[in-house]
Amino acid sequence: MLFVGNSLTATNDLPATVAALARGAGRRPVEYATVAPGGVNLEDHWNLTGARDALLAGPWDVVVLQQGPSSLPESQENLRTWATTWADLARAHGIRPALLTVWPETERSYAFPAVVQSYRAASVAARATLLPAGPAWLAAWRRSPKLRLYGPDGFHPSVLGTTLAALVVYTRLTGTPPSAIPLPYRAPTARILRRAAADALR
């Protein structure tokens, strides 16, 4: 599994968290690589070539693509264009493309619906599997509004937020129900995360 993103992927090491969930569930190990420098989008990754080189070096079953919230009109267009470009390259090499929906900064929480719609539209345009981490956060807050999914800066995820994103990634890509994945939290919190992931994946 190749992850191509930025600090939203790198913070708390989302790929390693996905692999840890697989281990905890006694499932097939997840082998992964990550190209996720801070502050870059998918267009930057294309021009910098390191992520392309990693993709072509494979073999990978899946490439997980991620950029910033992409809620503004020009950012939505950029996401659609470059998600499609990356997805086409992935499919040409027998790799399944997936797109990870993220979240806005806390001070722009009003943009959450636009972020969700932006990633949904981009996944359709790119014919990529949608990994709805952002919607899972919303589903978790509906059950527990004070759940701390953001880290201290109000944008990057807390460890809990990364765990929920990883649960969405792993269960969507493997078809494993969230209820089957052990989580390193007390039962009430683990239950909220599993149900939130299930809600987002419906």
Regions found by a protein language model. Give the residues of each.
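Conserved SGNH/GDSL esterase-like catalytic core that processes O-acyl groups on lipids
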Residues: 1-2, 8-81, 91
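Generic detection of long, well-ordered alpha-helical segments
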Residues: 8-11, 109, 187
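Long, well-structured alpha-helical subdomains associated
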Residues: 181-202
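Generic signature of intrinsically disordered, low-complexity, basic-rich segments
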Residues: 6, 124, 192-196
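Alpha-helical cap/lid subdomain in secreted, periplasmic
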Residues: 52-163, 167-172, 176-182
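A short, amphipathic alpha-helical segment
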Residues: 19, 23, 170, 174, ...
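Ser/Thr-glycine-rich phosphate-binding loops at phosphate-binding pockets of nucleotides
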Residues: 6-7, 158
